[in-house]
Amino acid sequence: MFFTQPPHLVKAEELKQEPPKGTAYSVAIPGTEQPGRSRVYRAWNAQKELLTTLDPQVTTAHDMFESTANRQPKNHCLGWRPYNSTTKTWDPYQWLTYETVQKRRAAFGAGLVELHQKHNCHRPGQYGVGLWAQNRPEWQITDLACISQSLYSVSIYDVLAPDATEYIINHAELNCVVTSLPHIPTLLKLKSSLPNLKMIVSLDPLDGPEQNGHSKRALLESMAAGLDLAIYTIDQVEELGLASKRGYNAPSASDIVTINYTSGTTGPPKGVVLTHGNAVAATSCGLTTIGQARGDTMCSYLPLAHIYARLAEHTAFWGGARIGYFHGNIVELVDDLKLLKPTGFMSVPRLYSRFGTAIRAATVEQPGFKGALSRHIVAAKMANMKNPDPSKATIKHALYDRIWAKKVAAALGLERAKYMISGSAPLDPTLHNFLRVATGTDVVQGYGLTESYASATAQSTQDLSSGNCGRLAPCTEACLVSLPDMEYSVEDKPFPRGELLLRGNNMFREYYKNDDETSKAVTEDGWFRTGDVCTVDAQGRFIIIDRRKNVLKLAQGEYISPERLEGVILSELGYVAQAYVHGDSSETFLVGIFGVAPDLFAPYASKVLGKTIAPTDVEGLKEHLNDDKLRRAVLRDLERVAKKHKFAGYERVRNVSLKVDPFTVENNLLTPTLKLKRPPVVKMYRTLLDQLYGQANEEQSAPRAKL
C-alpha cells in the first residue's frame, strides 16, 4: 500500500541533508563576536532564521498528536506486554490504535478537569497534574490528556525518594497525582506533609474478585480515611469525562507543556518550565536528525520523567511511528527488543557499554576460528569506515554485514534499527566506532539538557567521526565564553574553547518559582549557561572537553575533570558498572570507588584469585572484593587504560575500593537519571576515602626491594 509522506516529514528530510562541499555543519556568523565571547554559531541551513516548526499549522504538542491521529487513526500507537498470571511470564505485545488513544486521552482530560471542579481545585488558567509511574501506555495517555485541556504534567521519577517526591508535589502545588498502584501507599504516608493533595488517580485497577472489604480499593480507602484525600481509577475518570461532554481546551504555543524537575545533584530539584513552542521546535529538530515515519517502531524504556525520553516519544507521535513499552525489568530489555524489532534505538553510554562488552565477549574475544573471523571482519570494516576519502568511508559491507553484523544486531533485537542514538553523557570513541562496525548501524551522539528540551546538537548519520556531539540543531544557536580561571579562551588555537551558551526556540522559559536560579543560569541577553566546556572543530562540530561545575583542583594546582576520567574507565573496563573518581585539594593524586557488575566481574575475579566465583553468587563475590590481589589487578587495568588514553600523571587513579552497588537512588547517592551526587558521595564515604589516601601514601613511601 502506497501513501504520501506528509509535508512536515518531507521538509524534515530536506533539513537532514548534508551541507554543500566546503560548508561546515555549524557556521560562525560574522560580526556577532563580543569581548570574551565567540561568534554566534548556527546550523548551516538555519543561518538566517532558527526553526520554529516543520508545519505552520502545528504549534503545540496537542497539534502534533492530533495531526497524526487524524491522518492514520487505525495505525498502531501504544503497545505493551500483558503479564500472564497463569504462566508467570509476559505475553506478546498488544496495541492501542491512534484512534483509541485519541478518544481515551480526550475522555481522561475532560475527566481530570471535572475531578478538579468536584473537589473545588479547578482554577482559571493553567495548573499542573502530577504523573508518577514507570513507562507504560497510560503514562502517555495521561500526558496527552493534560495537554488536551491546557493542563500541564509534572513528572515524578518512578524511583524518586519520598523526600524529593514531597518537595515536588508541594513546590508545584499539585492537587492531583496520577500514579501506579505501588506508589499510592507512599502518597498516603506523605499526606500529612502534602496539604494541597486532594486526589489520587490509580493507573491500575483497584477492584477484583476479593470479598467485600478486602479489595485494593477498600484497603486503600480505609488508609485514606480522615486524610481529606479521594482515590479514583483512570477508568472512573475517563467515564466522568465522557459523561461531561466536555470538548478540547487546546493550548497555545506559549502555554506550559510540562514542568520537568531536574535531578538535583547538589540541591533541591529545580522545576524547568517548558512550553508547547519548546516542544514543537525540539521535535522538529528531532525529525531532522533521525526521522520517524508510518511503519516505524520505537522501544520506550528510558524514564519518561526525563525530557530525553519524552522528546523521543513526541518525535514518534508526529512522525506516525508506534511506541512499544518495555515490560518493566531493564535486565530483560533485550527480550522486549527481540519482540518489537525497533527501527531505531535511543539509549545512554552506560547501556551501550554493556552492549559492547557482550558483543566482544561473543565475537572478537572468542577462541579459535570464530574469534579469528570476528577480529578480521571488525578490522576490515574499521578500515572501510576510516577511509581517508569521505565519499568512500562506510560502515557497510556487502558480505560481512549479511553473514556477521546482521546476526550481532539480531542478538540485541536491533536487526531492523536504522540508527542508534546516544545521549546524556559522552560516548567513548572506541566504543562508538566498534558499535558502528559490529552492528552495521548508524550510531550518532547527541547533546542536550532539560533546559533545551533535550535538543541542542546531534551528529549527522552520514558523519562517521567520533568524539564529538555533532552539529547544532536548526532551532538552536550557540556561542562560547572564555573561562580565564580554567585557562580556556575563545582566542585559543586552532579552535576556540570556552563554556557553551545556548539560545533558541527550544530553550526553557524559567525555573519555576525560582528567579534567583533563573538569573544565575540565563544572561541578560537570553543565553543559557550550560556549565559544559566546549570547542568547535573546523567542520562546525561541537566537542565537550570539560565541565565547569565539577572540576577538582589538586595540591599542586592541577585541574581535574573527574567525569571525563570516569567516562573513559566505564567504557574501557566492562566489569566496572559505577565509577567515582575523587581528588582532595591537599593531595597530589586521585583515588576511586568503583561498583562492579557481578556477572562480568565474577569471571575476572575467579581468574585473578584462582578460585571459582559464580556470577550469581553476589554475596560470595562481596566477600572477596577486599582481597588485595583483586585491588592490584584492577589498578594494573587502570594504568593500562591511562596509558592508552594518555592521561597525565596526576589524572591516574592510584588506589581504589571495589563494591557492589555503592551508589544507588535509595541511598541518595544517585539521581533518578543515575547521575552521581558528588557531595553526598564524599560525605558518606569520607572515612573510606581517607583510608584509600593513607594506604596509597604508605605504599608510595615504602622502600622498594632492589632487584
Swiss-Prot record:
Pathway given in the UniProt record: Secondary metabolite biosynthesis; terpenoid biosynthesis
Compartments where located: Peroxisome matrix
Region of interest (Fatty acid-binding), residue spans: 525-549
EC number: 6.2.1.-
One protein family per Pfam: AMP-binding
Recorded catalytic activity of this chain's protein: (4E,8E)-10-(4-hydroxy-6-methoxy-7-methyl-3-oxo-1,3-dihydro-2-benzofuran-5-yl)-4,8-dimethyldeca-4,8-dienoate + ATP + CoA = (4E,8E)-10-(4-hydroxy-6-methoxy-7-methyl-3-oxo-1,3-dihydro-2-benzofuran-5-yl)-4,8-dimethyldeca-4,8-dienoyl-CoA + AMP + diphosphate
GO molecular function, one term: polyketide synthase activity
Bridged cysteine pairs (disulfide): none
Any single GO CC term annotated in Swiss-Prot or TrEMBL for this entry: peroxisomal matrix
Alphabetically ordered keywords of this record: ATP-binding, Ligase, Magnesium, Nucleotide-binding, Peroxisome
Residues bound to ATP: I259, N260, Y261, T262, S263, G264, T265, T266, G267, P268, P269, K270
One GO BP: terpenoid biosynthetic process
InterPro entries according to UniProt: AMP-binding_CS, AMP-dep_synth/lig_dom, ANL_N_sf
Motif residue range(s): Peroxisome targeting signal: 705-707
Stored PANTHER family: AMP-BINDING DOMAIN-CONTAINING PROTEIN-RELATED, LONG-CHAIN-FATTY-ACID--COA LIGASE
Function: Acyl-CoA ligase involved in the biosynthesis of mycophenolic acid (MPA), the first isolated antibiotic natural product in the world obtained from a culture of Penicillium brevicompactum in 1893. The peroxisomal acyl-CoA ligase 891 converts the intermediate MFDHMP-3C into MFDHMP-3C-CoA which impairs its diffusion from the peroxisome. The first step of the pathway is the synthesis of 5-methylorsellinic acid (5MOA) by the cytosolic polyketide synthase mpaC.
Annotated family: Belongs to the ATP-dependent AMP-binding enzyme family.
Protein name: Acyl-CoA ligase 891, peroxisomal
Organism field: Penicillium brevicompactum
